[in-house]
């Protein structure tokens, strides 16, 4: 079994907090990077994250906090990146330590803007991290349900299955079940696309489309996802597995889904800016929509749902008009 060494959670949001909760079920001591020192000070004083999942309390004596990214990278072998993809480059700007010999696990369900790269590709191309040191954590897993200890299924994807199994075993608990996969790229793209489709589901919800149509939308979404995954990385995969379809369904239907909430606001008539201001949280699918539209220009996959969401968010076409056109294309 691969020795993970010191494990660091890299991020301070709700999913980072949920992952920290899962890890502390198994590890004796956790390392945790947060950019803001004042957030660390509040965390130590309150013994919980002051901004996210405040009901989850931690034994802070078992946590070493860092606001210096170079220090945490120096001290840890396994780095779990859990921050919004638009902020990843900014967090790494101050990094002087090399990452090529670290085990990098990305739990970021988004694409790095401007680069148009899923996070594993970003670490591979920009930081020369080899495939065997890159992993992805995916699956239907709302942070709020992890906080409540509700049963959750996760998948660790890595080309090195020994490393994947080590991380998967570290996450297992009474309420977390895990498995492994070698489909790193497929899992990452699926996790990006499901956010786009959740926005579509939210827009339809805001426009008062019912459950009958929502099911048709999700059925077409999984077909669209499968077409893209086959084009970008053609391996034998079961797209109906929980890490693909399961993640799509929970993000598209759940009230915990910030992408669905964002889409619902757009469907009700909010502008993109006003919806973002009112939510006060990042809807990864907004950024993912533009990135996926750009990426698909290379592959020319038929993706009418992606196109519709892009037209609504970026071309400012009326949601009612665009979704009506989409409904006419479904059978």
Language-model-detected regions and their locations in the chain:
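A short helix-to-beta-strand connector/capping loop
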Residues: 56-64, 130-133, 174-176, 301
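NAD(P)+-binding Rossmann beta1-loop-alpha1 motif at the extreme N-terminus of oxidoreductases
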Residues: 1-56, 63-67
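Conserved active-site and cofactor/substrate-binding residues in soluble primary-metabolism enzymes
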Residues: 10, 14, 18, 38, ...
